[in-house]
């Protein structure tokens, strides 16, 4: 299965070659997918080549050949510029709604509770492709939130269990792009993978640290990681 960004790049190359017969340049691909650097395009092309969707033709500049398209190909699915928050496991292969999280809405109980949008499932484990999908709303105590915009994510995975975050929990996230060392954040890696990890700095690099010794800390250059919000609360259902 392709990630959202891999599929967007493949379809962008396919549509450009249909129009002009020439593959787009790396700069054009970077701009179309709203990536920070061309290194992200190189990684996506390598992944597509390894999966058998494209082929690089030797001894020719900008020489790419599309071998096949995804089974769920839709001509209306085009690269989109920016999305927030970035979450996982929603409607992969379908055009997502591109709506930012709304401010939490008070409900009719004297203002003691508010409704927060649940934007999908976040990986507390190996990062999965980042897409946006507002699935439903959840009611939380108003004093859990404070100021700012908030959204909720359902946790998938066990990499944060030592921080008390378990598979199936719902985390409440304050939307934002900054974090302090030690904060648990929603991090977007290479504009295509979203994960829930503890934020650290290692010199000029960013470390995404799990709270489970079975998972390694992942180190990235600062241009590869975007903070999408900080953990402010957690909800657990007992069955």
UniProtKB/Swiss-Prot annotation:
The entry's active site is 159 (for autocatalytic cleavage activity), 197 (for autocatalytic cleavage activity)
Q: Which GO terms describe its biological process?
A: DNA repair; DNA replication; negative regulation of DNA-templated transcription; proteolysis; SOS response
UniProt site (Cleavage): 124-125
Q: What class of enzyme is it?
A: hydrolase
What's the domain of life for this entry? Bacteria
Per its record, the protein catalyses: Hydrolysis of Ala-|-Gly bond in repressor LexA
What InterPro entries does the record tag this protein with?
Answer: LexA, LexA-like, LexA/Signal_pep-like_sf, LexA_DNA-bd_dom, LexA_repressor, Peptidase_S24_LexA, Peptidase_S24_S26A/B/C, WH-like_DNA-bd_sf
Return the annotated DNA-binding positions. Answer: 26-46
**Enzyme Commission numbers on file:** 3.4.21.88
One term of GO molecular function: serine-type endopeptidase activity
Keyword set includes Nuclease: no
Q: What Pfam families does this protein map onto? A: LexA_DNA_bind (PF01726), Peptidase_S24 (PF00717)
Q: Which UniProt keywords apply?
A: Autocatalytic cleavage, DNA damage, DNA repair, DNA replication, DNA-binding, Hydrolase, Repressor, SOS response, Transcription, Transcription regulation
Assembly with partners or alone: Homodimer.
Concerning its family, UniProt says: Belongs to the peptidase S24 family.
Q: What does this protein do?
A: Represses a number of genes involved in the response to DNA damage (SOS response), including recA and lexA. In the presence of single-stranded DNA, RecA interacts with LexA causing an autocatalytic cleavage which disrupts the DNA-binding part of LexA, leading to derepression of the SOS regulon and eventually DNA repair.
Q: What protein is this chain from?
A: LexA repressor
Gene transcribed to yield this protein: lexA
């Amino acid at each position: 299965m392709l990630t959202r960004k891999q599929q967007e790049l493949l379809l962008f190359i396919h549509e450009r070659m249909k129009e002009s017969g020439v593959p787009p340049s790396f700069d054009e691909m970077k701009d179309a997918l709203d990536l920070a650097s061309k290194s992200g395009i190189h990684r996506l092309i390598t992944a597509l080549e390894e999966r058998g969707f494209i082929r690089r033709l030797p001894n020719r500049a900008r020489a790419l050949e599309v071998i096949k398209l995804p089974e769920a190909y839709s001509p209306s699915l085009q690269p989109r510029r920016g999305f927030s928050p970035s979450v996982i496991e929603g409607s992969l292969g379908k055009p997502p709604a591109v709506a930012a999280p709304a401010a939490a809405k008070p409900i009719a109980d004297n203002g003691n509770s508010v409704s927060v949008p649940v934007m999908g499932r976040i990986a507390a484990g190996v990062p999965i492709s980042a897409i946006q999908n507002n699935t439903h709303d959840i009611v939380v105590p108003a004093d859990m939130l404070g100021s700012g915009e908030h959204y909720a994510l359902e946790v998938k995975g066990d990499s944060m269990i030592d921080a008390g975050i378990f598979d199936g929990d719902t985390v409440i996230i304050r939307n934002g792009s900054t974090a302090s060392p030690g904060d648990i954040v929603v991090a977007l890696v290479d504009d295509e993978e979203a994960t829930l990890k503890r934020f650290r700095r290692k010199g000029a690099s960013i470390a995404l640290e799990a709270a489970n010794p079975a998972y390694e800390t992942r180190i990235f250059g600062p241009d590869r990681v975007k903070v999408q919000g900080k953990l402010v609360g957690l909800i657990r259902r007992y069955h």
